[in-house]
């Protein structure tokens, strides 16, 4: 039987901590495989370069997507989201997941959701819509 591929998108330490049990469950399921897409603060030394945390936990990273974290202007946010859509879209087109899991409401996740939607990839948006200050979705 062909395993179903579940893409997991994470953009920061807080999301990753909450996604950890989802990743473990997929990893332990005989009919599922995960493809971990890491972006945002995970790749930024100013935020602790938490990419190392993920690899120490034993998870394989399928793709690293650099998205500039310049919040100096609204235009910079628009450019970051646009770049994210293009970059994440390329990754999703390559790995061809059966679905993607995106956590919360940050702009990196927003980029992932837009890319997935345009590629007809079903999306599981976990804890979206919670009241946040500065959220993107």
Regions found by a protein language model. Name each.
Residues 28-31, 59-60, 93:
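Generic secondary-structure signature for well-ordered alpha-helical cores
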């Amino acid at each position: 039987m062909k395993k179903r591929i579940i893409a997991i998108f994470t953009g920061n330490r807080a999301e990753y901590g909450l996604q950890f049990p989802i990743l473990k469950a997929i990893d332990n399921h005989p009919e599922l495989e995960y493809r971990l897409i890491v972006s945002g603060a995970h790749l930024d030394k100013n935020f602790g370069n938490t990419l190392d945390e993920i690899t120490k936990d034993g998870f394989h990273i399928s793709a690293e997507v650099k998205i500039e974290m310049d919040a100096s202007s609204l235009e910079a946010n628009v450019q970051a989201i646009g770049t994210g859509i293009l970059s994440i879209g390329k990754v999703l087109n390559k790995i061809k997941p059966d679905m993607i899991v995106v956590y919360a409401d940050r702009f990196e996740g927003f980029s992932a959701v837009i890319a997935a939607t345009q590629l007809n990839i079903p999306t599981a948006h976990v804890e979206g819509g919670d009241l946040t200050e500065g959220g993107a979705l």
